[in-house]
Amino acid sequence: MEYRILGKTGLRVSRMGFGGIPIQKIDAERTRQLMLQLRDAGVNYIDTARVYTVSESFLGQALEGIRQDFILASKSMSRDRESMARDIDISLENLRTDHIELYQVHNRSAADLEKIGEGSFVGHIFVSHNNLLKN
């Protein structure tokens, strides 16, 4: 597997990642088998979201004992700081982890991004679908 450093994060991620949305089509046991296969193939980047139904919870179960082998990314569509903090807490619980390396936010103002808590439970914050110039 080839790896790249992700921007200025310092994170070494596999060129091939896994998008967690298809997990809703399989069960928790098959999710565990899939994570072991991905790890053995050298894939270390997993993207998920609470809106992907069972994805985070199945991944949380599946990564037990092998969490350190993966870089997790999740996201939120929340529009205010309190909702975002709640989303992060729920994702941490679902994923059975104490941190998420990459957290993607939608619809946030530039001023609010500084308040979310980058560096504590969230390693790095990425912005998408945002019009920062108007905020």
Language-model segments: what does each one mean?
Residues 1-70:
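N-terminal binding-site loop/beta-alpha segment at the start of enzyme catalytic domains
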Residues 18, 48, 74, 102-105:
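Conserved beta-strand positions
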Residues 19-29, 73-85, 109-114:
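Active-site mouth loops of central-metabolism enzymes
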Residues 36, 82-135:
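Glycine/proline-rich, positively charged
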Residues 52, 79, 106:
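Active-site beta-alpha loop architecture of Rossmann-like, nucleotide-cofactor-dependent enzymes
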Residues 56-75, 122-135:
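Alpha-helix-loop-beta-strand connector modules within alpha/beta enzyme cores
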